[in-house]
């Protein structure tokens, strides 16, 4: 199995790429990981210009030699190329799995809306930098290479539809041409490094857009590294989620085992068989 790796948002390092390749060679020798050189370009905030990031993703996605595309990390930048990318994808792109999370939710959403390939929320190569990161990378490879059900978020049930996003990313997606139809889907959301008031505001925005979308329900993943505000907010992240779900008539289904951490689980978009 050949897995192409690109950076639609921010850059990676060759040293960390070598660590991922070495780990994969030990745990999944049947997988050939190919880090595109674009992953290592640094141009201001981004892994190269918009044109360079777009070209790398489209080239790998359209290359029949690759079975899957693995996004190297998040950050910011994927929304700047997503619409153009979808317009340039050809037949070979339709048979691939696309794996990532965080800012890559922009591309996962766009791919899912366009019916191209199989978008999947899950760990990325950058997670090797975390404590327990080897397990996160191996979990992703177990899914990509073997379709291992143990990699899946534990609440996933066959015969149901799912989607998973970082909440702030989703808040920027709703109301745009990238946003897919989530009718009859269980939506899972997580967040990192946001004040609780910003988390609350994002939930308001997402809920207003999705209150009539026919969601099957919502699960809340981990909300981590919350900055300390100058005064207590007065609600936990779960209480915020429950309040907005109640207000908008969305079934709150409890916790989800996803987040910006090494325990992040795999959530395929769409119908899980």
Task: Write out the residue ranges for each language-model feature.
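Conserved anion/nucleotide-ligand pocket segment
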Residues: 116-175
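ATP/nucleoside-binding phosphotransfer catalytic cores, i.e., glycine-rich phosphate-binding loops
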Residues: 222-273
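Internal helical hairpin/lid segments
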Residues: 178-230, 237
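Conserved beta-alpha junction segments in alpha/beta enzyme cores
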Residues: 12, 16-17, 161-194
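Short, acidic/small-residue loops that bind anionic groups at enzyme active sites
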Residues: 87-110, 118-124, 247-253
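N-terminal glycine-rich "phosphate-gripper" loop used for MgATP/nucleotide binding
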Residues: 68-83, 101
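ATP/NTP phosphate-donor binding region
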Residues: 1-65
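Short internal beta-strands
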Residues: 34-37, 100, 215-222
